[in-house]
């Protein structure tokens, strides 16, 4: 059963999304209008999906290939995106830009890494999860390999 507060939040989500659709430059106006803690505690992905569908924004679900490391993992936050590409020159530093991205994470950011499904190396592991947790990040979504899965599960850091 929805409470009046839930319905009010639903309206605020719709208002924020419409505002954001007009000012596509940043997702931060959307986040500033919605309390992410309330979304975490009271909203399910089905409610958010229904709101987006009602606004004509269909197909906003993640690919069936993107799954949580553990079924009890979920996350809510602002996307912090990174594009990665396979590197074939083994003599070059491969981590500087990735570390800079992790160092730039902030509270409630969700690191979203696109690698076009590369299977050459793990994109995420325990060290990055630890660094992201320290910076207040809310999770990570990757379209490639993850390592140190048992350690990440013990940490409880949401990785998809």
Language-model-derived ranges and their functions:
Residues 2-97:
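Intrinsically disordered, low-complexity regions enriched in acidic/Ser/Thr/Pro/Gln residues
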Residues 44-51, 78, 97, 101, ...:
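General structural feature for long, well-ordered alpha-helical segments within catalytic domains
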Residues 76-80, 107-109, 138, 155-157:
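A generic structural signal for short beta-strands and their flanking turns/coil linkers
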Residues 81-82, 112, 142, 159:
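Short hydrophobic-aromatic micro-motifs
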Residues 87-89, 117-120, 146-148:
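A short acidic, glycine/proline-enriched capping/turn motif at secondary-structure boundaries
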Residues 101-143:
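Extracellular/luminal Protease-associated
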Residues 143-149, 153-160:
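Long, charge-patterned amphipathic alpha-helical coiled-coil/hairpin "stalk" segments used as oligomerization
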């Amino acid at each position: 059963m929805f409470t009046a507060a839930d319905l009010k939040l639903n309206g605020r989500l719709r208002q924020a999304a419409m505002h954001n659709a007009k000012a596509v430059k940043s997702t931060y106006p959307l986040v500033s209008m919605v309390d992410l803690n309330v979304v975490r505690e009271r909203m399910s992905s089905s409610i958010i999906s229904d709101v987006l569908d009602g606004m004509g924004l269909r197909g906003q679900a993640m690919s069936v290939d993107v799954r949580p490391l553990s079924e009890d993992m979920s996350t809510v936050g602002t996307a912090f995106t990174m594009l990665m590409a396979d590197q074939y020159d083994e003599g070059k530093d491969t981590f500087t830009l990735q570390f800079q991205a992790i160092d730039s994470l902030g509270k409630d950011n969700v690191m979203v890494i696109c690698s076009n499904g590369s299977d050459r190396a793990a994109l995420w592991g325990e060290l990055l999860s630890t660094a992201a947790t320290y910076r207040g990040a809310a999770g990570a979504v990757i379209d490639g390999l993850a390592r140190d899965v048992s350690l990440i599960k013990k940490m409880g850091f949401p990785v998809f």
